[in-house]
Amino acid sequence: MSTVTFVTGNANKLKEVIAILSGSQSEGGESKVGNFTIVNKSLDLDELQGSIEEVTIHKAKSAAEILGGPVLVEDTCLGFTAFNDLPGPYIKWFVKSVGLQGLVDMLYKFEDKSAKAICTFGYCEGPGKPVQLFQGITKGSIVESRGPTNFGWDSIFQPDGFDKTYAELDKEIKNSISHRFRALDKLRDFLVSQ
C-alpha cells in the first residue's frame, strides 16, 4: 500500500476531504482509497500568481520536492461572472482583505450575482514527476452571508438548485454536490485505477 501526503494546514478542509474520499475517518486523520493511504502534513508553500491550474501544479511540484514522495495538494477558487471569474484563485486573500461582506458588496451594483466554485486537486508521484489535475465545478450565486462563517466563503455561496448556502447545508448534502466532491470523485477514480 502506497502513502500519499495531502498537504494542507486547514483542519476543516482535511475533515471534508477524508469524509468525501472514504466516508469515514480513521485514527490520525488517515483515509484509505484503493491501494493508497492518505496522510496529512501542513507545509507553508509559496503560491505563485496565475491560473488555478498553474497554482496547483506549482504547489504539487514544490510539495513533492520537499517531501520526496507522492503528494496531493488542493486549490480552490471562487469566480464571479460579473468580474470575469475574479477573485478566482485569489479568493483567500480577498476574504482576508475585505471580508465576506466586502465580497458581497463588490457585486452590489451588478445584476448578475452568479459565481463558480472551482476546486482543483493536484497529484504528483514525487520529485520531477508530472502533476495530474482533477477539477470540479459547482455553479451558484453570491448571497448575503447565512450560516456559520468558519469555513472560508461557504456562508455567501448558494449552489444552484438549493435555497441554502454551503454553510447552511447539512455536511452530507454539501459533500455530495460541492466543487470539492466533484474533483475528489475524479481523483478517487484515478487512485482506485492505479
UniProtKB/Swiss-Prot annotation:
Enzyme class, broadest EC rank: hydrolase
Example GO molecular function: ITP diphosphatase activity
InterPro entries named in the record: ITPase, ITPase-like_fam, RdgB/HAM1
Known catalytic reactions: ITP + H2O = IMP + diphosphate + H(+); dITP + H2O = dIMP + diphosphate + H(+); XTP + H2O = XMP + diphosphate + H(+)
Cofactors that this protein relies on: Mg(2+); Mn(2+)
Pfam families for the chain: Ham1p_like
Record-level GO BP terms: deoxyribonucleoside triphosphate catabolic process; nucleotide metabolic process
Sequence positions that bind ITP: 8-13, 59, 75-76, 92, 151-154, 174, 179-180
GO-annotated cellular components: cytoplasm; nucleus
Enzyme nomenclature, EC number: 3.6.1.66
Main localization (coarse): cytoplasm
Keywords: Cytoplasm, Hydrolase, Magnesium, Manganese, Metal-binding, Nucleotide metabolism, Nucleotide-binding, Nucleus
Binding site for Mg(2+): 47
Function noted in UniProt: Pyrophosphatase that hydrolyzes non-canonical purine nucleotides such as inosine triphosphate (ITP), deoxyinosine triphosphate (dITP) or xanthosine 5'-triphosphate (XTP) to their respective monophosphate derivatives. The enzyme does not distinguish between the deoxy- and ribose forms. Probably excludes non-canonical purines from RNA and DNA precursor pools, thus preventing their incorporation into RNA and DNA and avoiding chromosomal lesions.
Assembly description: Homodimer.
Similarity-based family: Belongs to the HAM1 NTPase family.
This protein's name: Inosine triphosphate pyrophosphatase
Provenance organism: Scheffersomyces stipitis (strain ATCC 58785 / CBS 6054 / NBRC 10063 / NRRL Y-11545)
Underlying gene: HAM1
